[in-house]
Regions:
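N-terminal active-site beta-alpha-beta segment that forms phosphate/nucleotide-binding
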Residues: 1
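Flexible, glycine/small-residue-enriched loop-and-beta-strand segment within the central core
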Residues: 4-16, 21-89, 115-116, 122-124, ...
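Short beta-to-alpha loop/turn elements within the nucleotide-binding domains of ABC transporters
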Residues: 88, 99-100, 106, 115
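Conserved active-site beta-strand element of glycosyltransferases/polysaccharide synthases
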Residues: 112
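Acidic/histidine-enriched, glycine/proline-rich intrinsically disordered or flexible terminal extensions
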Residues: 130-146
Length: 146
């Protein structure tokens, strides 16, 4: 499910798995391939950038642009206003906190956040019923989803 507006360079370089969901104002610069696994969720204003430009102004001003692919594993939630930079691989079962700038690979089962984005801790079975700030899913809801 894509909540408009949605922006991309080409669209032909974007591959999504089952149950993909992005909130409004997603921006994917797909000059290189972008791959999302199954059950990925993107918050509002998430930007996925495969495109880059040279550092030196003489080279940059020539119009040269390059692209590096981005891979996002299964069961990933990328929080609102986050940016994923060229060449990054985000593992499976990962949560990226809101307002993060992901410049390096993030391993499976990680909770990561910040600018630059860093792993805060691993996600474990102890987290199965946790919500925001260690609140737990109440029993009535757990009976339905658990």
């Amino acid at each position: 499910m894509i909540t408009p507006p949605f922006y991309c360079d080409y669209g032909s370089n974007i591959e999504v798995g089952k149950n993909f969901m992005t909130n409004y104002n997603c921006n994917i610069l797909d000059v290189a391939k972008v791959t999302f696994g199954d059950n990925c969720m993107l918050g509002p204003n998430v930007a996925i950038y495969t495109a880059g430009h040279p550092l030196h102004p003489k080279t940059r001003n020539s119009g040269y642009e390059y692209g590096k692919p981005i891979v996002v594993g299964d069961n990933v939630w990328i929080g609102g206003n986050s940016v994923v930079c060229p060449g990054v691989h985000i593992g499976s079962n990962v949560v990226i906190g809101a307002d993060s700038v992901v410049t390096k690979d993030i391993p499976d089962w990680s909770l990561a956040a910040g600018n630059p984005c860093k792993v805060i801790r691993l996600i474990t079975e102890d987290d199965i019923r946790k919500l925001f700030r260690n609140e737990e899913i109440d029993d009535d809801v757990w009976k339905i989803i658990g």
